[in-house]
Amino acid sequence: MMPFRPSRRALLAAAPLLALPLGSGRAIAAGSDFNSFLAGLRRDALAQGIRPGTVDLAFRYIQFLPKVIELDQRQPDHVLTFAEFITKVVNPQRIEDARRNAGENWGLLQRVHQRYGVQPRFIVALWGVESDFGKTQGSYSVPAALATLAYEGRRGPMFRGELMSALKILDQGHIRADGMLGSWAGAMGQCQFMPSTFLSYAVDFDGDGRRDIWKDRADVFGSIANYLARLGWRGNESWGREVAVPGNFDTRLSGLESRRPLGDWMRLGVRSVGAPLTGREAADASLLLPDGLGGRALLVFDNFRATMRWNKSVKFAASVGMIADGIERG
């Protein structure tokens, strides 16, 4: 996954760019330097054993995308506080949508849970945060976006590797080149996997021979659960709780690096917002103050850390947990 950017989906909605073959009259003409760069990419792909036919077809959809560079370099006008972000993302409509989607897919979610040990509510919550339950997957040609970022982006070598991974996905027949669409940064499908993440963690849950995270919900849910399980998810635990801390709380005790038993936190004056804290929830927890003392506070467990291995953002991980809680209360 790419680092979480709260405005990413808004940017995608405001500036969609459909994949077009280079032969199209609407295609952006690439300069000679970019064409030379593509020749090197082609050699690399063939050297890695990707079939020439796959490379030829994929490169028909590769063009330089100036908008991708603009988005990569854009600085947000306003970085949302934790409280602002949670209010925006964990809203009543998203909770309602999450409950409805959980109910509509409950049988499939239970089968995924039995195989991977990840609770259905967390699968649905992650699906909702990543792609609004599959509705916002991005409309950029992934090969074109990755080639553009490899050529002129801030992390060229990384994106070059991601492009090679994307070509391997095409070579394995999981998706057609004209259907490999995603975000401007190359995150794909309903779970927004980068190509390298796809190769490592996407699964063919329904056994049809393809790992289809674009249209097949069985593969989407299975891939989300497999990834979380591989990241250390504990199926008998939750993610954390929103809590209240006293006004004189020592903030030096907060942070993911500080772990204490729940009893210790309670003796320090930490209190749950909602149901009381119990020793059943987890052996150790960390206290987070994303907006500082006086803002919202979280007591988080190991599953929160697993979610942050998916995406290194406290806001992201907390939103997943809170939406999952909303499903459970439904």
Predicted regions: what they are:
Residues 177, 184-189, 194-277:
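Flexible, glycine-rich surface segments
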Residues 37, 44-47, 52-61, 157-181, ...:
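A contiguous strand-loop segment
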Residues 87-216, 221-223:
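Acidic/His-rich structured neighborhood in mature extracellular/periplasmic domains
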Residues 50-59, 119-125, 178-181, 211, ...:
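Surface-exposed patches in mature extracellular/periplasmic domains of secreted proteins
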Residues 30-104, 113:
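An acidic, Gly/Ser/Thr/Pro-rich helix-cap/linker signature
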Residues 2-5, 10-29:
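N-terminal export signals
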